[in-house]
Amino acid sequence: MENVEFQSIDEVDDISTLDEYQVALDAGLTPDAALKAVNRVSRDNARTPFQWDASANAGFTTGTPWLKVNRNYTKINLESQKDDPDSVYQYYRRLLALRKDPAYAETVVYGDLLPVFEDQDRVMAYYRKSADQTLLVIGNYKTQPQALTLPSKIKHIVLNNLPQLKTD
């Protein structure tokens, strides 16, 4: 699911977002600019009804939801992702399985977290280290590929969401 873009401040329920909207107005922003600013940080993004399927209210309720359903619910929903091996849903299933896998659980759950590539734009990367294992986690937040010089050769890719990943 993606963050919802509220079209009006009247669609917002979060008191903190409402307060920030008022602060933005008091600072001289137009109502449109203030709404755009709070849309990026509103906690209501995580509180919208879960998008189960493409039916009314995304299959969440036959009643009236407390917040509006994201407009993209007919395309982005659990039903549309269940059978797609490249979907976010399937990626998270693999991620949860990795966390439960006895070969990695100790490191994933309890390993030390050591940041790396902190100066690389739009990359979040860190090591998870336990006594006998080190995992390197890299997230690229750009829309295009990035090149990183890795500190050592990758022995094994444990989890990846890209069809092609170059490690040379």
Task: Outline where the language-model segments fall.
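Loop/helix patches that line or flank the sugar-binding groove of alpha-linked glycan CAZymes
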Residues: 1-135, 141-146
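C-terminal beta-sandwich/jelly-roll accessory domains of carbohydrate-active enzymes
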Residues: 141-168
